Regions:
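ATP-binding N-lobe of GHMP and related small-molecule kinases
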Residues: 1-99, 116-126, 151-153, 161, ...
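Hydrophobic C-terminal alpha-helix "anchor/cap" residues
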Residues: 32-35, 76, 132, 231, ...
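Conserved, helical-rich catalytic subdomain that frames metal- and/or nucleotide-binding sites
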Residues: 51-53, 142-144, 148-239, 252-267, ...
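Short glycine-rich phosphate-binding loop at a beta-alpha junction
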Residues: 90, 239-243
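DPxDG-like acidic metal-binding loop motif
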Residues: 99-129, 141-143
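Conserved glycine-rich beta-strand-loop-beta hairpin in the small C-terminal domain of fold type I
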Residues: 246-249
Length: 276
Protein backbone atom coordinates (compact mmCIF):
# COMPACT_ATOMS: atom_id res chain seq x y z
CA UNK A 1 0.00 0.00 0.00
CA UNK A 2 1.20 3.52 -0.79
CA UNK A 3 2.25 5.52 2.25
CA UNK A 4 1.92 9.30 2.45
CA UNK A 5 3.75 11.83 4.63
CA UNK A 6 1.96 14.97 5.79
CA UNK A 7 3.52 17.95 7.59
CA UNK A 8 1.39 19.38 10.37
CA UNK A 9 2.72 22.82 11.33
CA UNK A 10 2.45 24.48 14.73
CA UNK A 11 0.49 27.70 15.11
CA UNK A 12 1.34 30.76 17.17
CA UNK A 13 -1.06 33.30 18.60
CA UNK A 14 0.74 36.57 17.93
CA UNK A 15 -1.95 38.34 19.95
CA UNK A 16 -5.10 37.19 21.74
CA UNK A 17 -7.96 39.20 23.24
CA UNK A 18 -10.74 37.73 25.37
CA UNK A 19 -13.80 39.79 24.38
CA UNK A 20 -16.55 38.11 26.39
CA UNK A 21 -18.18 34.82 27.16
CA UNK A 22 -20.60 32.83 25.04
CA UNK A 23 -22.75 29.94 26.27
CA UNK A 24 -19.94 27.37 26.52
CA UNK A 25 -16.76 29.09 25.38
CA UNK A 26 -15.16 32.48 25.74
CA UNK A 27 -15.36 34.85 22.80
CA UNK A 28 -11.87 35.61 21.59
CA UNK A 29 -10.13 37.35 18.74
CA UNK A 30 -6.60 36.55 17.68
CA UNK A 31 -3.83 37.05 15.17
CA UNK A 32 -2.40 33.68 14.18
CA UNK A 33 0.59 32.56 12.15
CA UNK A 34 2.24 29.23 11.39
CA UNK A 35 5.86 28.21 11.84
CA UNK A 36 8.29 25.65 10.44
CA UNK A 37 8.05 23.38 13.50
CA UNK A 38 5.80 20.48 12.55
CA UNK A 39 4.58 17.02 13.43
CA UNK A 40 4.81 14.33 10.76
CA UNK A 41 1.76 12.26 9.89
CA UNK A 42 2.26 8.99 7.99
CA UNK A 43 -0.86 7.54 6.44
CA UNK A 44 -1.71 4.46 4.41
CA UNK A 45 -4.87 2.53 3.56
CA UNK A 46 -5.28 -0.82 5.26
CA UNK A 47 -7.57 -3.80 4.98
CA UNK A 48 -9.17 -3.78 8.39
CA UNK A 49 -12.44 -3.17 10.16
CA UNK A 50 -10.89 -0.37 12.22
CA UNK A 51 -8.50 2.52 11.85
CA UNK A 52 -5.13 2.18 13.58
CA UNK A 53 -3.55 5.24 15.19
CA UNK A 54 -0.05 5.39 16.67
CA UNK A 55 1.92 8.24 18.23
CA UNK A 56 5.72 8.29 18.31
CA UNK A 57 8.41 10.83 19.08
CA UNK A 58 9.59 12.88 22.03
CA UNK A 59 6.16 14.30 22.84
CA UNK A 60 4.05 11.18 22.27
CA UNK A 61 3.60 10.22 25.92
CA UNK A 62 0.26 10.58 27.71
CA UNK A 63 -1.77 11.22 24.57
CA UNK A 64 -5.29 9.94 25.19
CA UNK A 65 -6.80 7.22 23.04
CA UNK A 66 -9.56 9.74 22.43
CA UNK A 67 -7.68 12.45 20.55
CA UNK A 68 -8.23 14.81 17.63
CA UNK A 69 -7.32 12.17 15.03
CA UNK A 70 -9.56 9.47 16.49
CA UNK A 71 -12.38 12.00 16.89
CA UNK A 72 -12.01 13.11 13.27
CA UNK A 73 -12.07 9.55 11.93
CA UNK A 74 -15.07 8.63 14.09
CA UNK A 75 -17.00 11.64 12.79
CA UNK A 76 -16.11 10.85 9.17
CA UNK A 77 -17.13 7.22 9.62
CA UNK A 78 -20.41 8.20 11.28
CA UNK A 79 -21.25 10.38 8.27
CA UNK A 80 -20.01 7.65 5.88
CA UNK A 81 -17.65 10.17 4.28
CA UNK A 82 -14.76 7.72 3.92
CA UNK A 83 -16.71 5.07 2.00
CA UNK A 84 -15.71 2.43 4.56
CA UNK A 85 -12.00 2.97 3.86
CA UNK A 86 -9.71 2.39 6.84
CA UNK A 87 -6.29 3.88 7.51
CA UNK A 88 -3.19 3.31 9.55
CA UNK A 89 -1.98 6.65 10.83
CA UNK A 90 1.32 7.25 12.61
CA UNK A 91 1.99 10.70 14.05
CA UNK A 92 5.52 11.68 15.03
CA UNK A 93 5.06 14.34 17.70
CA UNK A 94 7.62 17.13 17.47
CA UNK A 95 5.25 19.77 18.86
CA UNK A 96 5.01 19.70 22.67
CA UNK A 97 1.65 19.03 24.30
CA UNK A 98 0.15 21.80 26.44
CA UNK A 99 2.35 24.38 24.76
CA UNK A 100 -0.25 26.71 23.23
CA UNK A 101 0.79 25.78 19.69
CA UNK A 102 -2.28 23.75 18.74
CA UNK A 103 -0.43 20.53 17.96
CA UNK A 104 -3.44 18.22 18.18
CA UNK A 105 -5.81 20.62 16.44
CA UNK A 106 -3.36 21.17 13.59
CA UNK A 107 -2.94 17.38 13.24
CA UNK A 108 -6.67 17.08 12.58
CA UNK A 109 -6.70 20.07 10.22
CA UNK A 110 -3.70 18.76 8.26
CA UNK A 111 -5.29 15.33 7.88
CA UNK A 112 -8.55 16.91 6.68
CA UNK A 113 -6.64 18.98 4.11
CA UNK A 114 -4.82 15.89 2.86
CA UNK A 115 -7.98 13.80 2.53
CA UNK A 116 -9.62 16.61 0.56
CA UNK A 117 -6.57 17.08 -1.69
CA UNK A 118 -6.58 13.37 -2.57
CA UNK A 119 -10.36 13.45 -3.15
CA UNK A 120 -10.79 10.82 -0.46
CA UNK A 121 -13.00 13.29 1.39
CA UNK A 122 -15.57 15.32 -0.52
CA UNK A 123 -17.27 17.89 1.65
CA UNK A 124 -18.84 21.33 1.27
CA UNK A 125 -17.45 24.34 3.14
CA UNK A 126 -20.32 24.68 5.60
CA UNK A 127 -20.15 21.02 6.56
CA UNK A 128 -16.35 21.22 6.71
CA UNK A 129 -16.48 24.08 9.21
CA UNK A 130 -19.07 22.22 11.28
CA UNK A 131 -16.84 19.13 11.26
CA UNK A 132 -13.82 21.15 12.40
CA UNK A 133 -15.80 22.75 15.23
CA UNK A 134 -16.84 19.33 16.55
CA UNK A 135 -13.19 18.32 16.88
CA UNK A 136 -11.92 21.51 18.52
CA UNK A 137 -12.24 25.27 18.29
CA UNK A 138 -8.73 25.71 16.81
CA UNK A 139 -9.08 23.13 14.02
CA UNK A 140 -10.71 25.53 11.56
CA UNK A 141 -7.67 27.83 11.86
CA UNK A 142 -5.43 25.15 10.34
CA UNK A 143 -7.57 24.46 7.28
CA UNK A 144 -5.60 27.17 5.45
CA UNK A 145 -2.20 27.75 6.97
CA UNK A 146 -1.41 31.39 6.36
CA UNK A 147 -1.51 34.52 8.50
CA UNK A 148 -4.99 34.49 9.98
CA UNK A 149 -7.19 37.05 11.72
CA UNK A 150 -9.89 35.53 13.91
CA UNK A 151 -12.56 38.09 14.75
CA UNK A 152 -14.73 37.91 17.87
CA UNK A 153 -17.76 37.01 15.73
CA UNK A 154 -15.97 33.87 14.56
CA UNK A 155 -15.18 35.17 11.09
CA UNK A 156 -11.76 34.35 9.68
CA UNK A 157 -9.67 36.42 7.28
CA UNK A 158 -6.53 35.01 5.68
CA UNK A 159 -3.66 37.34 4.78
CA UNK A 160 -0.61 37.01 2.56
CA UNK A 161 2.64 36.43 4.45
CA UNK A 162 4.67 39.50 3.53
CA UNK A 163 7.06 39.80 6.46
CA UNK A 164 9.21 37.00 7.88
CA UNK A 165 9.96 37.06 11.57
CA UNK A 166 12.19 34.61 13.41
CA UNK A 167 11.09 33.10 16.68
CA UNK A 168 12.68 31.66 19.77
CA UNK A 169 10.15 29.42 21.50
CA UNK A 170 10.72 28.24 25.05
CA UNK A 171 8.55 25.79 26.97
CA UNK A 172 9.14 24.69 30.56
CA UNK A 173 8.77 21.08 31.64
CA UNK A 174 5.09 21.66 32.46
CA UNK A 175 2.12 22.58 30.29
CA UNK A 176 -0.77 24.91 31.04
CA UNK A 177 -4.35 23.74 31.38
CA UNK A 178 -6.42 25.66 28.83
CA UNK A 179 -9.57 25.06 30.87
CA UNK A 180 -7.95 26.33 34.06
CA UNK A 181 -6.47 29.45 32.45
CA UNK A 182 -9.76 30.47 30.86
CA UNK A 183 -11.62 29.82 34.13
CA UNK A 184 -9.55 32.59 35.74
CA UNK A 185 -10.60 35.26 33.22
CA UNK A 186 -12.53 37.94 35.15
CA UNK A 187 -12.39 40.93 32.80
CA UNK A 188 -12.72 41.39 29.07
CA UNK A 189 -10.97 43.48 26.42
CA UNK A 190 -12.43 45.75 23.79
CA UNK A 191 -12.36 44.32 20.30
CA UNK A 192 -9.37 45.41 18.20
CA UNK A 193 -9.74 43.22 15.12
CA UNK A 194 -13.26 44.02 13.92
CA UNK A 195 -11.85 45.34 10.66
CA UNK A 196 -9.13 42.86 9.69
CA UNK A 197 -6.21 44.35 7.76
CA UNK A 198 -2.87 43.11 6.46
CA UNK A 199 -1.04 45.77 8.50
CA UNK A 200 -1.99 43.93 11.68
CA UNK A 201 0.93 41.59 11.01
CA UNK A 202 3.50 44.39 10.85
CA UNK A 203 6.01 44.10 13.73
CA UNK A 204 5.35 47.56 15.15
CA UNK A 205 1.61 46.91 15.21
CA UNK A 206 2.09 43.51 16.86
CA UNK A 207 4.43 44.97 19.46
CA UNK A 208 1.64 47.09 20.92
CA UNK A 209 -0.74 44.14 21.37
CA UNK A 210 -1.14 41.55 24.15
CA UNK A 211 -2.25 38.06 25.03
CA UNK A 212 -4.99 38.46 27.65
CA UNK A 213 -4.25 34.98 29.01
CA UNK A 214 -0.60 35.72 29.70
CA UNK A 215 -0.96 37.53 33.04
CA UNK A 216 -3.21 34.74 34.32
CA UNK A 217 -0.67 32.07 33.36
CA UNK A 218 2.22 34.03 34.87
CA UNK A 219 0.36 34.36 38.19
CA UNK A 220 -0.56 30.68 38.21
CA UNK A 221 2.89 29.44 37.19
CA UNK A 222 5.66 31.64 38.73
CA UNK A 223 8.38 29.66 36.93
CA UNK A 224 6.86 30.80 33.65
CA UNK A 225 7.32 34.38 34.79
CA UNK A 226 11.01 33.72 35.39
CA UNK A 227 11.43 32.47 31.82
CA UNK A 228 9.57 35.41 30.33
CA UNK A 229 11.52 37.95 32.40
CA UNK A 230 14.77 36.56 31.03
CA UNK A 231 13.55 36.45 27.43
CA UNK A 232 12.55 40.12 27.59
CA UNK A 233 16.23 40.95 28.21
CA UNK A 234 17.45 39.11 25.09
CA UNK A 235 19.15 41.58 22.73
CA UNK A 236 17.25 42.83 19.68
CA UNK A 237 13.97 41.09 20.42
CA UNK A 238 10.96 42.93 18.94
CA UNK A 239 8.58 41.65 21.60
CA UNK A 240 8.03 38.63 23.84
CA UNK A 241 4.61 37.03 24.28
CA UNK A 242 2.95 33.81 25.37
CA UNK A 243 1.11 31.86 22.68
CA UNK A 244 -2.39 30.53 23.31
CA UNK A 245 -3.00 29.58 26.93
CA UNK A 246 0.69 28.65 27.32
CA UNK A 247 3.01 27.37 28.43
CA UNK A 248 5.25 28.41 25.52
CA UNK A 249 6.80 31.87 25.59
CA UNK A 250 7.90 33.30 22.24
CA UNK A 251 10.49 35.98 21.45
CA UNK A 252 10.28 37.55 17.98
CA UNK A 253 13.27 38.82 15.97
CA UNK A 254 13.91 40.52 12.63
CA UNK A 255 16.94 38.38 11.75
CA UNK A 256 17.89 34.73 12.01
CA UNK A 257 21.28 35.71 13.41
CA UNK A 258 19.76 37.62 16.32
CA UNK A 259 17.40 34.73 16.98
CA UNK A 260 20.25 32.20 16.96
CA UNK A 261 22.27 34.33 19.38
CA UNK A 262 19.26 34.52 21.68
CA UNK A 263 18.87 30.74 21.53
CA UNK A 264 22.45 30.30 22.76
CA UNK A 265 21.90 32.70 25.65
CA UNK A 266 18.67 31.02 26.65
CA UNK A 267 20.16 27.50 26.65
CA UNK A 268 23.04 28.66 28.83
CA UNK A 269 20.53 29.97 31.37
CA UNK A 270 17.76 27.34 31.10
CA UNK A 271 19.43 24.23 29.71
CA UNK A 272 16.75 21.85 31.01
CA UNK A 273 13.86 23.58 29.23
CA UNK A 274 12.71 22.73 25.70
CA UNK A 275 13.64 25.50 23.29
CA UNK A 276 13.89 25.98 19.52
Amino acid sequence: MTSFKIKSHAKLNLALNVIGRAVKLHKIESLISFISLHDLIYLKKIKSNNHKIFFTGKFSKNISKINTISTLLNLLDAEKLLNNQKFEIKIRKNIPHGAGMGGGSMNAASLINFLISKKILKIKNKKLNDLAAKIGSDVVLGLKQSNTILSSNGKIKRCVNKKTLYVLIAKPYFGCSTKLIYSKVVSFSKSQFKRPQQKMFQPQYLKALNNDLEKIALRKYPKLNKIRSFMVTLPKNIFVRMTGSGSSIVAYFHSQKDCSNAYGQFKRKFNSHWCI
